[in-house]
UniProtKB/Swiss-Prot annotation:
It is an enzyme of class 2 (transferase). It catalyses: O-phospho-L-serine + 2-oxoglutarate = 3-phosphooxypyruvate + L-glutamate; 4-(phosphooxy)-L-threonine + 2-oxoglutarate = (R)-3-hydroxy-2-oxo-4-phosphooxybutanoate + L-glutamate. The keyword Transcription does not apply. The gene is serC. Homodimer. Its EC number is 2.6.1.52. This is Phosphoserine aminotransferase.
Length: 361
């Protein structure tokens, strides 16, 4: 096999090589059954065992309490932007949202289709370079829930704290930082995460929801979007994204083998420290995000002269450092350094950055 490139894509993102190799080995013949997982009936004993093991491994990794349901659904995180208010927001109620970037803004825009939304705080006043402290939030007294995005993949803005909302359910989009470090699931009413960053391939979204929040869907909520129906049917009301679920299960097993999310936190800290040190120690590269809001997973940076962007990307591609172009709405560069992107990838990137700066500064 030729050497695999270092993939810094924001999503669909890098998967652990060991996971891909195992999937390759099992592609035509899963554990002697003579067929691929993608050919299995989702009702078969074999697939039900695969799905159950994946759920248990995720529960183990995040220490999910027993009074939470873990759902493996379709539609990605973007579908959750509608599914959450349809399940949790009464027609005459209000929900609080915190806007810190493009993804939380999209969640707000979608939720407004279904009811009253109060934007309790916005990072717009900081040009999306910092997160407003909770003392500055304008929370509703009787909100159905409070929603925020823990890590904005495009802007590179991440909460390093968990909002405190008392008895009001806290809902969080963790699509891009779930499993990157330990969390206390009991602090949240609902956690959701699109799979294609830190969980597995696209086509899947994981929802972790406290049981007392089930059964609240509006009468107009489509059957397929009702959390209780999904929970009562083991995420198999219809045919699920079986292969994505299976591959995500392999990622969970790999994470356990690495030492779990505690080990991931140590590695991820080393990766982000190395990259930010290279950026901050240079007059050639810059990152404008407030230090206490810098993302561990998505690191945007700019070159001193944007006319050099194409040359930088071309040189990176030649060295197997792929997908470093920033989002079209932001520009510049972005290195997404999820769990499957090793420290060696960041070391190679930092070495190239130094080489490029020496040549062009």
């Amino acid at each position: 096999m030729s050497k695999r490139a270092f993939n810094f894509c924001a999503g669909p993102a890098a998967l652990p090589t060991a996971v891909l190799q195992r999937a390759q080995a099992e592609m035509l013949d899963w554990q002697g059954k003579g067929l691929s997982v993608m050919e299995m009936s989702h009702r078969s004993d074999e697939y039900v065992a695969i799905a159950s093991q994946a759920e248990q491994d995720l529960r183990d990794l995040l220490a999910v309490p027993n009074d939470y349901k873990v759902l493996f659904l379709q539609g990605g995180a973007s579908q959750q932007f509608a599914e959450i208010p349809l399940n949790l927001l009464p027609e005459d109620g209000v929900a609080d949202y915190v806007e810190t970037g493009i993804w939380s803004k999209k969640a707000i825009e979608e939720a407004r289709r279904y009811g009253a939304i109060n934007v309790a705080a916005s990072a717009k006043s900081y040009d999306y370079f910092a997160i407003p402290g909770q003392n500055d939030w304008q929370l509703s007294k009787n909100a159905a829930y409070v929603h925020y995005c823990s890590n904005e993949t495009i802007g590179g803005l991440q909460f390093d704290w968990v909002p405190q909302t008392g008895d009001i359910p806290l809902v969080v989009d963790m699509s891009s930082d779930i499993l990157s470090r330990p969390i206390d699931v009991s602090q949240f009413g609902l956690i959701y995460a699109g799979a294609q960053k830190n969980i597995g391939p696209s086509g899947l979204v994981v929802v972790i929801v406290r049981e007392d929040l089930l059964g609240r869907a509006r009468s107009s909520c489509p059957t397929m979007l009702d959390y209780k129906i999904s929970a009562d049917n083991g995420s198999m009301y219809n045919t699920p994204a079986t292969y994505s679920w299976y591959l995500s299960g392999l990622v969970f097993q790999w994470l356990k083998e690495q030492g779990g999310v505690e080990a991931m936190e140590r590695i991820n800290r080393a990766k982000k420290d190395l990259l930010y040190k290279a950026i901050d120690g240079s007059d050639f590269y810059s990152n404008p995000i407030a230090h206490n809001a810098r993302s561990w997973m998505n690191v945007p940076f700019r070159l001193a002269d944007e006319k050099l962007d194409k040359a930088f990307l071309a040189g990176a591609d030649e060295r197997g450092l792929l997908n470093l172009k920033g989002h079209r709405s932001v520009g510049g560069m972005r290195a997404s350094i999820y769990n499957a992107v090793g420290l060696d990838a960041v070391e190679a990137l930092v070495a190239y950055m130094a080489e490029f700066e020496k040549e062009h500064a």
